[in-house]
Amino acid sequence: MPTTLRMLNNNLLIVIGTFAVCVYIVLQRSKARLPLPPGPRKWPLIGNLLDMPGGRAWLKYAEWSREYGSDIIHLSAAGTSILVLNSAELVNELMEKRSAIYSSRAQLTMLHELMGWKDAFSFAPTNPTWRAQRKIFMQALNPNNAALFHGKQLRATHELLWRLHKGPANLFHELHHWAAILIMDITYGIRGDAADPYIETAVEALDSMAIAGAPGAFLVDAVPLLRHMPEWTPGAGFKRQAREWNVLRQKMANRPFIAAKQQITSGSYTPSLVSNALEAVDKNQDLAEQEELIKGAAVTSYGGGSDTVVAAVSAFVLAILQHPEIQAKAQRQLDEVLGHGELPSFQDVQSLPYITALVKEVLRHNPVTPLAIPHLLSEDDTWDGYWLPKGSIVMANAWAILHDENTYPDPMPFNPDRFLRPDGKLDETVKDPATASFGFGRRLCPGRHIALSSIWISVASILACYVIRKEVDAAGREVVPDGEWYGGPTLFNRPLPFKCRFTPRSKAAEAIIVSLENTV
């Protein structure tokens, strides 16, 4: 009898196993029969390689979305499957609700392998290294402890105010300097002039990262076999470029980290991401390995934070030059709230809703990361009758989301009032652009609260002290900025350099600015 039962059980297992295999085969075949999402016509072998937009790709993707009547479009670049999501609803469904399979990162040959950014937090696949660095971020930059960094943000912003007063402003140089000393202090605890030796290298390294991080920027990303070409081969100039950019990355990662450790050892340090993380290391685990993780988290913090705030504040200045009435309205509210001789502080946020609305519109109108950083689909999936192949690069079109007429009526004009109620208070029913400005799903930027508050305090402080005016030529005529934006492949959307003037609003404002020299 027991033998008979065993035979029945074995037969039952065989039947169940066979049934499961059949179901799997049927499901796989049904997936294979499902169509890919719509998109431009694909050519043999190269797919849409010739259709890929070289710059401002988010505009083309939004155009294709309208042309094909679909929130999701599909492209193929020499065999690489690319999915572009063009609505908040679809991004929420896939990147949020199905984040388990949509949270990894596509590995770009140029950026990750040749330039060495593969283990950087923002670019790493979902693996133990990424999880460990995420834990470092969450502990060291916890939003509940945001006030710990307010002093650093105010110090850097006050230095920016003083530097803008020194003479004809090279705005972009000053903004890069402001962002650098701010992020160096928050990340490494390196302050003021001590940060100067690291700034130039960091700016160059971040520029190279922004270029190489844009899908389609280098042919080697579509045809990885090209990475084996000797550097001297015609057409292999990208390898020399990658080698030079890799050196910049290493300098950017190593030098300030070593300096931060020296400060901590000597006891002459202020709280920072690095100091907080080093204090939290597990003494029973490999210390060298933990330090490498902290170093990787730190360089990512510097990279993501610096470019984000520079792009946003330069976009704010350009918007003010194009809309002087917005500047006047913001300054009227500042004058109502601030006492004589006062500069804005973080305690004034609730009292300055127009400044907050202005920052929201800066983030919405020309988002800093219009396509975020591409995700990777780690398993086959389906959506609305379409097959979404495993291994696809998945891009969320933040620009399209932030220009959705159903969410932001009449989205093209720059208009901070869209975020305000008739009584001048913030309209909480209008979706906050920050929800689409700092990544999606499990890849949401852990330092977004610091970036947002840094942008806010700089905007409020500049408007409290200065009138932003157009540059004048030798004949005294105003020079109207072109308002052009960088048109090449890039992760970060930023305006091209333009000239302007920062004129103190009054003698009292000028006195405040001059007094800041002794405090920075």
Curated annotation (Swiss-Prot):
It is an enzyme of class 1 (oxidoreductase). The keyword Metal-binding applies. It is found in: Membrane. Heme binds at C445. Its EC number is 1.-.-.-. It holds the Pfam family p450. It is a single-pass membrane protein. Pathway: Secondary metabolite biosynthesis. InterPro entries: Cyt_P450 (IPR001128), Cyt_P450_CS (IPR017972), Cyt_P450_E_grp-I (IPR002401), Cyt_P450_sf (IPR036396), Cytochrome_P450_fung (IPR050364). Its cofactor is heme. One of its GO terms (cellular component) is membrane. The chain crosses the membrane at residues 7-27. One of its GO terms (molecular function) is monooxygenase activity. PANTHER family: P450, PUTATIVE (EUROFUNG)-RELATED, P450, PUTATIVE (EUROFUNG)-RELATED-RELATED. Cytochrome P450 monooxygenase that is able to use pyrene, phenanthrene, 3,5-dimethoxy-trans-stilbene and 3,5,4'-trimethoxy-trans-stilbene as substrates for oxidation. Belongs to the cytochrome P450 family. This is Cytochrome P450 monooxygenase 98. It comes from Postia placenta (strain ATCC 44394 / Madison 698-R). The lineage of its organism: Eukaryota, Fungi, Dikarya, Basidiomycota, Agaricomycotina.
